[in-house]
Amino acid sequence: SILQYRDTVQRHFVASMATAETTAEHREKILSDFYLYQQKAIEAGKDDDERTFILPNVRDRAATHRLATLMAEHGVEVKQASESFRACGERYKAGAFIIDTAQPRGLFAKTTFTQQVDMDKTFVAEQERRRANKLRDQIYDVTGWSLPLMFNVDTESCDDAVKVKGEMISADMPLQSEMVNADAKVAYLVPWGDMSAGRFLTAALRAGIQVKSADQAFKMESGSYPAGTLIVEVAQNDKTLAEKISRIATETGARVVGVDTSWVVEGPSFGSENTAGMSAPKIAIAWDEPTSSLSAGSLRFVIERQFNYPVTAIRTGNMSWANLSDYQVIILPSGNYARHLGTGGAENLKDWVSKGGVLITIANATQWAASENVGLLDVKREYALKDDDVTAQDDSDVIEGTTIENREGFLNAIENEQELPDYVAGILTRVEVDQEHWLTAGVNPEVVAMVTGNDIYSPIKLGSGK
């Protein structure tokens, strides 16, 4: 029989009502179990080797603040220290966040903060057996999920309770800005390297403020500033600049340092060729089929909600003929674009890129851009690297016979000459960052990234990019 849309709605309604009725009938048992679960969490936390998690809140204030308030949003008790303190032999400054796992939500905190949770050895052995037999693994989702690692936030643990004065934070606690010399005579500097600086930049550009970015690190009497630091010169903006800077700093939580001199002790000066002017780009994103809703939705959420910057959604099919000259950046989320864009779409995007457009491709979209028919990227997708030479397939109708002595020999005989690498089911991996590239301005030398899939590309040649 044909399943109608109304049938799915009805069944969803029936299932929801049945769940609600069952919960109501057994409410005492459910509430009792929930209470005991939280009580168990308190006792487990007291004896845990990682009883307390500490977020020093020294590097990347914005990410640390976001992680702390996210935990508070999920009911975790998070304290912010109001004074410096010592814990397990280490000293921490005021402002550090503390999570004691001896609390009702302690098991949740433990699960999301523990950096290494080994999979069951028997399960791992079974997956390796399946892989050796050319079968897919049974891993349902990602294998790494430590929130501090995913946020690239420094976190330390202590096997004891931490006694320090402080206050429990709320989910809506704002990130406090740091404003030095609000009435600067020459310029305002915003050190690059966290989300608050990024939000400051988007807000400043939307407010019509003239902003520069330093391609290299530099030093002044007021301190050292990393590559990517934003420079807002007083002389290049109107008389309301100080008021705008103060307002944007408060809204974004950014750290802003006003300076009364342009004298640079070391590094490029404000007027050198190593300080580039920033412009407010118009951004478009491919929408609807064939884009992945998860990929497109998450990208748009980050730009529009976390950076408060507008994005125009364009139906993918329209990119084959639409005039793209109004946009400086186009994002292609993960998706299979060959059929929907076709030759016309590829040529339209190629022409747009040749005129200075910036094309950003995600996951499967990169496969499309790097394909031979499109050629937007001078890279090739790689096959798996074989440990041993695999005999090429003979296309003759009849071939010489071979002796297969054991199962290993049989598996080798049926192995494809070329096949894609094994699929990675979501791992957290440490990435070494090229500190000489302009895209990495303000980024730490090492970051943690989520890796999933089996796409491996050849390195891009210097003549085509870096």
PLM features per residue range, with description:
Residues 1-466:
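Intrinsic-disorder/low-complexity accessory segments
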